[in-house]
Amino acid sequence: MRLAVLFLPVLLGAQAPSVPYDPNDPDGLVVSPNGRYRHAWKRQGVWIEGRLSNPFGRPLAGIPAATAGEIQQMNATLSALAAILKATPEGSQRIGYFMKESRLFSYVHPPDLPSGFAAARLPLRFSCGFFPFYNTDTLRNGVWVADRGGETESVYFEFNLLPGKLRSNVIAKEERGPNLNPIEFYPRPDLSVTYRGFPVADGQDLILTRGGRDPWIAVPYGRALKAALPEYEKDRDTAERRLADLKKAEAETLSPAYEQQMRDHLEKTSGSLRTQNPAKWQGRVASMERELAYNREKASREANPQRDQNGNWYWHPIDAYADASRRLASMTAEEASRPACFEEVPGEQGRYAMRGHVRAAGSGGGTCRELVMDNYGYFDPKLGRAAAQILVVRSLGRCAKVVEGRLVGPSMPAKMQLPPQGCYRHVPIWEQMDWERVRALLAP
């Protein structure tokens, strides 16, 4: 039910588009051309509260199932959140649309956890998705019946789920053996954009945290470089395989058999010229020999890459792997404990798996981004599993951009054919809602 919406930024309060309904009709009804549907542009829609459920399956061994009290506590938090949205003018009036909720909860996945964390003590994850649908009636057996489905743009408010890498690329993975998922290392998401004082990570997901807590934790340089070494190795191996193919092609091109093959081909296609037109025959022979010399020179040049623009495809990954191996082998314990960062080098040829350098923080200049991983130490197990400790709004950026502290949403077409729904409804609700009340839903 999530449908992407393309938008052009316009400020809220822009000139209203023309509408297709009779302004004197109290419901603003517009019947579709086939007569099977009608849209109620002015009718106040309902707010359908979701029932908290877990569609993701039972918890794995060692994790207790959610108790009735925990389910009640999670549901109370989601109801309090919904009340904040419903308290806005847009959320309370709901002219032309209805709101449908989806309330879900799930358990932490033990194979994802770093060592030292007990899955049974980590909080339950729960969320509420909001789906604004325009009011539509369907004609069934001569009776108009209100529809309660369709497609729209949903946005989820997710509690107790760490934001993770968001839109950052995973730089390296720390393998941990069978039955455990690797730990992912990635650049810290960009938190420079804020809305109402809260960061909008990578311009997409709004994040509310408990004061002083960071949902990411720095990756030690030693761990990061060790995990990244297989990626450097992949690029080195790719370069070596390509070089081996070029060496093979060089040997074939320099062989007497290759020359004989070219002479045989010339004889087959132009041999009659030897007696019919000797001068032309000599010209063909000279041309073939020039081609042979060119092919051999080219094959030798490609099979012996130099440290220049033409040979960077080989030397860049070879040198990068050698440098990373040397740094890892000579690293002191003090160096290994320093935070790591990643310096991207998008222009380097031959770098496909590892498109940059893992370095110690402070050694890569201003372009070296801090490497982080999920911080499960963010959660306080003393608060109880159903306590709200972090909130991520996924994804505010699908519907709006932050411009000078305000949300800029999708522009409305000059002539609306259907009542506005989805992002057209989310954005004004967000602009009108009390985000400090939302923050207060988190444990102090």
Which role does the model predict for each range below?
Residues 2-13:
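Bacterial N-terminal signal peptides
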Residues 15-17:
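Boundary of Sec targeting at the N-terminus
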Residues 28:
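Aromatic-rich peripheral "rim/lid" segments of glycoside hydrolase catalytic domains that contact
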Residues 32, 38-389, 395-399:
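Short, solvent-exposed recognition patches
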Residues 388-420:
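Short, well-ordered beta-strand elements
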Residues 407-444:
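Surface-exposed amphipathic alpha-helical segments
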